[in-house]
């Protein structure tokens, strides 16, 4: 997977890279109380979420769906599907995020 350089334009507590290869990227993301991953989508890659501390919420548009993940639960968001990630009731949360396969991008959605 080719990665385009990017800078987060939103606050999170931490992001730890577990591995990054030519076609896959895996991070552990930690968000504090009230923090979130804003609405966005990816052109080619699938986001696979595994909740490590929660509960956490993954919301999608088209199709509109809400996934409430407890520790150990997972869900996938395919390419071109806008999604938003936050803690249930704005609580702190932590998740493993596996991304692939394809060129990484992050396209904000209002």
Question: What annotation goes with each model-predicted range?
Answer:
Residues 1-27, 38-39, 108-110:
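A short, N-terminal "cap"/entry segment at the start of jelly-roll beta-barrel domains
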Residues 31, 43-58, 98:
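Short, conserved beta-strand element in jelly-roll/cupin
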Residues 48, 91-106:
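A short hydrophobic beta-strand segment most commonly corresponding to one strand
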Residues 63-79:
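Short acidic-glycine-tyrosine-enriched beta hairpin
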Residues 85-88:
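Asparagine-centered strand-capping/turn motif at beta-strand->loop junctions
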């Amino acid at each position: 997977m080719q990665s385009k350089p990017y800078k987060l334009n939103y606050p999170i507590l931490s992001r730890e890279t577990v591995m990054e290869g030519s076609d896959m990227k895996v991070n552990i993301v930690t968000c504090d109380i009230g923090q979130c991953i804003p609405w966005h989508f990816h052109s080619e890659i699938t986001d696979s979420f595994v909740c490590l501390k929660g509960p956490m919420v993954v919301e999608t548009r088209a199709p509109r769906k809400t996934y409430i993940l407890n520790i150990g639960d997972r869900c996938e968001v395919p390419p071109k599907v806008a999604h938003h990630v936050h803690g249930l009731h704005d609580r702190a949360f932590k998740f493993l995020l596996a991304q692939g396969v394809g060129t990484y991008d992050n396209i904000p959605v209002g």
